[in-house]
């Protein structure tokens, strides 16, 4: 399951559990992005903090694990590299790449997207009521197997990382939106605090 996880929340965990059940997956590997190329216009929490929050959030589920492949690779994170690395580490595994359905809307702009479908099946998870306009995607993928791309609706995805960050900036509680250990980590590390306003000095 790929994502920025900034921070990871219960929606991510429920989605992973639901997909694991529906597709009978042995394991769900969470892969925090290193440097998300599509989010260069906003501040992203340090990779190590996002990795540790993901470890904390997934620790109690023996079916979940966390990979550092994107964080340790360096440079901008592209899904094609993520899948190549995971395939090299697990050459005999049937890979499913779980991501937000909204991200799949732009999949044809991803680097080497054709190659990615030869490595893994894609599962897009969405909040209730979200509709993916997939006509252009379907046209491009018509030569691929019918199960190359699946969509799964997950009610808990009404929670979003951006809302969690906004609440933290405003000193509002994020309890029960993210796992307890993540709340404690965010507090201890003082993540998502407002950026200090530069002090302006009047010339004397």
Curated annotation (Swiss-Prot):
The keyword Nucleotidyltransferase applies. Pathway: Cofactor biosynthesis; NAD(+) biosynthesis; deamido-NAD(+) from nicotinate D-ribonucleotide: step 1/1. It catalyses: nicotinate beta-D-ribonucleotide + ATP + H(+) = deamido-NAD(+) + diphosphate. Keywords: ATP-binding, NAD, Nucleotide-binding, Nucleotidyltransferase, Pyridine nucleotide biosynthesis, Transferase. One of its GO terms (molecular function) is nicotinate-nucleotide adenylyltransferase activity. Its EC number is 2.7.7.18. The keyword Amino-acid biosynthesis does not apply. GO terms for biological process: NAD biosynthetic process. It comes from the Bacteria. InterPro entries: Cyt_trans-like, NadD/NMNAT, Rossmann-like_a/b/a_fold. Belongs to the NadD family. Catalyzes the reversible adenylation of nicotinate mononucleotide (NaMN) to nicotinic acid adenine dinucleotide (NaAD). This is Probable nicotinate-nucleotide adenylyltransferase. It comes from Mycobacterium sp. (strain KMS). The gene is nadD.
């Amino acid at each position: 399951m790929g994502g920025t996880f900034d921070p990871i929340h219960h929606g991510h965990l429920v989605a992973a559990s639901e997909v694991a059940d529906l597709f009978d997956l042995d394991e769900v590997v969470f892969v925090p992005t290193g440097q998300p190329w599509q989010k260069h216009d906003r501040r992203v929490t340090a990779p190590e903090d996002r990795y540790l929050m993901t470890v904390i959030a997934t620790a109690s589920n023996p079916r979940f694990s966390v990979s550092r492949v994107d964080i340790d690779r360096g440079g901008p994170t592209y899904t094609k590299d993520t899948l190549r690395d995971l395939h090299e580490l697990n050459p005999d595994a049937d890979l499913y790449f779980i991501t937000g359905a909204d991200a799949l809307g732009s999949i044809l702009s991803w680097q080497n997207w054709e190659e990615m479908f030869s490595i893994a099946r894609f599962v897009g998870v969405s909040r209730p009521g979200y509709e993916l306009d997939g006509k252009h995607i379907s046209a491009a993928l018509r030569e691929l197997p019918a199960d190359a791309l699946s969509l799964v609706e997950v009610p808990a995805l009404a929670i979003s990382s951006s809302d969690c960050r906004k609440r933290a900036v405003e000193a509002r509680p994020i309890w029960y939106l993210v796992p307890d250990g993540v709340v404690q980590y965010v507090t201890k590390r003082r993540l998502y605090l407002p950026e200090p306003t530069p002090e302006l000095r009047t010339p004397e």
